[in-house]
Amino acid sequence: MLASLIIFVALLCNVTVISGLNDEGFALLTFKQSVHDDPTGSLNNWNSSDENACSWNGVTCKELRVVSLSIPRKNLYGSLPSSLGFLSSLRHLNLRSNRFYGSLPIQLFHLQGLQSLVLYGNSFDGSLSEEIGKLKLLQTLDLSQNLFNGSLPLSILQCNRLKTLDVSRNNLSGPLPDGFGSAFVSLEKLDLAFNQFNGSIPSDIGNLSNLQGTADFSHNHFTGSIPPALGDLPEKVYIDLTFNNLSGPIPQTGALMNRGPTAFIGNTGLCGPPLKDLCQGYQLGLNASYPFIPSNNPPEDSDSTNSETKQKSSGLSKSAVIAIVLCDVFGICLVGLLFTYCYSKFCACNRENQFGVEKESKKRASECLCFRKDESETPSENVEHCDIVPLDAQVAFNLEELLKASAFVLGKSGIGIVYKVVLENGLTLAVRRLGEGGSQRFKEFQTEVEAIGKLKHPNIASLRAYYWSVDEKLLIYDYVSNGNLATALHGKPGMMTIAPLTWSERLRIMKGIATGLVYLHEFSPKKYVHGDLKPSNILIGQDMEPKISDFGLARLANIAGGSSPTIQSNRIIQTDQQPQERQQHHHKSVSSEFTAHSSSGSYYQAPETLKMVKPSQKWDVYSYGIILLELIAGRSPAVEVGTSEMDLVRWVQVCIEEKKPLCDVLDPCLAPEAETEDEIVAVLKIAISCVNSSPEKRPTMRHVSDTLDRLPVAGD
């Protein structure tokens, strides 16, 4: 630091001889002097003979004052000089992915107008100064992938405008400061992974109501129980608590519900759902998770001596045993009579209507419903449900209301007809009618549909209820009014115009799809594979938030007799929009290792799906990569080149081989947004890695999602 100050003073002494540079210009020259290696020559045009520094690479000025210094990914090697403190108007400092080392100068924290400090991917070390609390306007703090140590200073809570806090992959330790959750109510991204943090997770963590993506506490040394307040985080947030020292029952509240066991692995002391380990010895927690277990039940781990004593003291007399047996026999007979009565009612029910259910059955629907999903065990394979079977506690409609509703066809496919249904109360639903077979496979159908119904995530289309009979199977979803991604990108026959998606909208869609797939792959009960991901299966909800649909549909259709398991589903739930169409112009480029794939099957299917192999999550990664290419290029997966046709992956490969500029690959509708070029290139590189012909070389969806989360979306 002393050396940099001497250099700075020496430069100031020569100000009249050298040029008219102001103090900020000389501060930047001191920064250049502190860089010992500049292999790309990124600082070559930083010359003392210039009138000001505003034309230098990486420097942005406003009214001749430096407001931004951004020199990422240049492999610069050096340290930060204290002279940076003279950049009094600096708002943004981005030095990510270089080779800077040493501690951060205290003067850096005196830049009270600083809004973003992005230093990830360097070798900075030392502890964070208490002076950091002076950065009251700071919104982005990314210090990940460095060598920082010590604890988070208490003063960091004064940076209460933070939206991004990423200190992952350092050597930070100690507990999180008290009041952590209450201080950062504006926080949208939190990543504390791969450090040495210890102590308990703050009880006020649920106050982070604006969090998005993944709240990552993984690979630390957090102890104690999981605070129930953690469930108060938005449902869209993934909570990663893996590989800590947490113990006790997992609270079944809010964002912690419907999480698969992978979110909690590496914590040997945790118990209760979704883990298989029951909470022995945590009586209060056990009752919280299982409300029907009385609090005076003895613990299961009582010693054998006590157990034997209890067995002796609780023995039953012969008369009591005989009475119990007689009651059981009477009960079985009563159940048999009830079942016979209900079965006769089932056979009397006749169904045919606008979905295949006859109008006269409306009057008898309530009589037929003897077995509801929440009232009894599954009946025989030939059972017929005469009412809607809800998969969501909020389902408040029945079959009779559904039959009275106005309905019209939205589309048809090989897996049945899709209707838009508007109930009398205004609720709009999408109803898919499956085949008329599968009468002997009810249990199989029920198992599948209930598993799908448990998937609750903002980026997964919700299956609300179903209906089953020998002649009819209906799947009932929330209606999504903005159509699907295929229509949003390319229009459909009969459309005259279509409003092009902006880059921000496309990026939001990319992130949402990735987030939904991460949920399917890592947080769903069985680590599912979608297997049929394509734009027509991506519905567009409010604020351009995507919803992945048709998960498990091909399997259900096969059970219902509507299709072969090899037929790919093609959901056609679309909006009542104005007729639109887009001309297919389009174009872009960048380099990486990948191999094109083309076959007579779906362009979205990975090459290995042509072999009879077990479904893999890497299939979905490949399909996602094709969708990314489609969003960037604005082209269909089959590209017309002259009189011939080429698949999109091969077309991009040709553009790279011919070293075409990015604008030749980019959708022309995105051309005016030239300032987003770095983001587009970053996404293109992700897409290319996703469509690698080798499944092992494709990234996981978690890695893809985390990478995309680093890219800001306008309006977020």
Curated annotation (Swiss-Prot):
Residues 575-598, 695-716 are annotated as: Disordered. One of its GO terms (biological process) is zygote asymmetric cell division. InterPro entries: At_inactive_RLKs, Kinase-like_dom_sf, Leu-rich_rpt, Leu-rich_rpt_typical-subtyp, LRR_dom_sf, LRR_N_plant-typ, Prot_kinase_dom, Ser/Thr_kinase_AS. Changing residue 534 to A: Loss of kinase activity, but no effect on GB1, CAM1 or CML8 binding. Residues 404-711 form the Protein kinase domain. Its main location: membrane. PANTHER family: OS05G0588300 PROTEIN, RECEPTOR PROTEIN KINASE-LIKE PROTEIN ZAR1. The CaMBD domain (358-373) is required for calmodulin binding. This is Receptor protein kinase-like protein ZAR1. The gene is ZAR1.
